[in-house]
From Swiss-Prot:
EC number(s) stated in the UniProt entry for this protein: 2.5.1.78
Any single Pfam family the record assigns to this protein: DMRL_synthase
Residues where 5-amino-6-(D-ribitylamino)uracil binds: W27, A59, I60, E61, V81, V82, I83, N114
Role of this protein: Catalyzes the formation of 6,7-dimethyl-8-ribityllumazine by condensation of 5-amino-6-(D-ribitylamino)uracil with 3,4-dihydroxy-2-butanone 4-phosphate. This is the penultimate step in the biosynthesis of riboflavin.
InterPro entries membership: LS, LS/RS, LS/RS_sf
Protein name: 6,7-dimethyl-8-ribityllumazine synthase
UniProt family annotation: Belongs to the DMRL synthase family.
Gene Ontology process terms (BP): riboflavin biosynthetic process
Catalytic activity: (2S)-2-hydroxy-3-oxobutyl phosphate + 5-amino-6-(D-ribitylamino)uracil = 6,7-dimethyl-8-(1-D-ribityl)lumazine + phosphate + 2 H2O + H(+)
Pathway: Cofactor biosynthesis; riboflavin biosynthesis; riboflavin from 2-hydroxy-3-oxobutyl phosphate and 5-amino-6-(D-ribitylamino)uracil: step 1/2
GO CC field: cytosol; riboflavin synthase complex
Binding residue positions for (2S)-2-hydroxy-3-oxobutyl phosphate: Q86, T87, R128
Length: 160
């Protein structure tokens, strides 16, 4: 899997000691399971032992569980997929999840990386899921972003 255009290469991270929480939905299980596998691999490769993993049914439940994880974790990864349908439901769910994740991150001063795919169709989600024939691994990217931000915050807070 070669990186997509414009995607920065993730440097090797030493995140040992970082407490990582991962919340992943179960809708579109093949995709969400792959996103979770990518996030777990990045965590393990970065020295994170035993991240807390919580599964929820749908994407709309992700922010409240991320909020609870942010209470006692240094970083949180939110994973899921919302695929456009025939009704405005797609926009409502995408907006609620995105705003919820952002609010949790800011309110808790804890990085919550948004790895929730919002796509027009299932193929677009599969292309981003980190499967062997996928173009990208958004689960891995989200985990890398969360861990990198947690390390940056740790460094900034140590200066204070």
């Amino acid at each position: 899997m070669s990186p997509a255009a414009g995607v920065p290469e993730m440097p090797a991270l030493d995140a040992s000691g970082v407490r990582l929480g991962i919340v992943a939905s179960t809708w579109h299980s093949r995709i969400c399971d792959a996103l979770l596998a990518g996030a777990r691999k990045v965590a393990a490769d970065s020295g994170v032992e035993n991240p807390t993993v919580v599964r929820v049914l749908g994407a709309i439940e992700i922010p409240v569980v991320a909020q609870e994880l942010a209470r006692n974790h240094d970083a949180v990864v939110a994973l899921g997929v919302v695929i456009r349908g025939q009704t405005p439901h797609f926009e409502y769910v995408c907006d609620a999840v995105t705003q919820g994740i952002t609010r949790v991150s800011l309110d808790a001063s804890t990085p919550v990386a948004n790895g929730v795919l919002t796509t027009d169709n299932e193929q677009q989600a599969l292309d981003r899921a980190g499967l062997p024939d996928s173009a990208e691994d958004k689960g891995a990217q989200a985990a890398g972003a969360a861990l990198s931000a947690a390390l940056t915050l740790r460094e900034l807070r140590a200066r204070s």
